[in-house]
Regions:
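Walker A/P-loop
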Residues: 87-119, 130-132
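Phosphate-binding P-loop
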Residues: 77-88
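Short acidic loop-to-helix transition motifs that present clustered carboxylates
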Residues: 121-127
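Conserved nucleotide-sensing/catalytic segment adjacent to the nucleotide-binding pocket
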Residues: 128-140
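AAA+ P-loop ATPase mechanoenzymes
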Residues: 1-79, 93-98, 108, 134-135
Length: 140
């Protein structure tokens, strides 16, 4: 006989929804690379689909002296002022096409070891609201 796991129910604003009994609840998605995902069902629920643990490169990455800059960014992010005052930190990469902006951003993401959320090309209804309601440190 098949092992049956009791169905669980979640309460969302007074409405109960059934979920699989094997469902595990986490306070955050944890570190990794995620893509914003919208379910195909009737409710079109938005979630995060894990793509990988870290950004991986299938080509050699040369040392171009970014470690000092990454150190400054990481020290700023982890500083008492940012932690105590719950501040945000924006980093803008600029340069011509092919100069390594995307690679640099991915290397920084790997180093900070916090969730990275990739926004897909297709439009997701309710995406802005979903992102605004995230209550954990992440890179979008």
């Amino acid at each position: 006989m098949k092992n049956l796991v009791a169905q669980k129910w979640i309460d969302e604003c007074g409405t109960l929804f059934p979920i699989d009994g094997n469902t595990v609840l986490y306070p955050t998605p944890g570190s990794g690379i995620f893509e914003l995902y919208q379910g195909k069902g009737q409710d079109k629920r938005i979630g995060l689909k894990k793509l990988s643990e870290k950004f991986e490169f299938n080509h050699k990455i040369y040392d171009v002296g970014c470690d000092n800059l990454f150190d400054i960014i990481q020290k700023t992010w982890e500083s008492d002022k940012f932690v105590e005052e719950n501040k945000n930190l924006g980093v803008i990469f600029t340069g011509y096409k092919g100069t390594g902006k995307s690679v640099g951003a991915k290397l920084l993401c790997n180093r900070l070891d916090i969730p990275v959320i990739i926004i897909p090309d297709n439009e997701i209804e309710g995406m802005v609201s979903f992102i605004q309601q995230l209550d954990f440190e992440c890179i979008v």
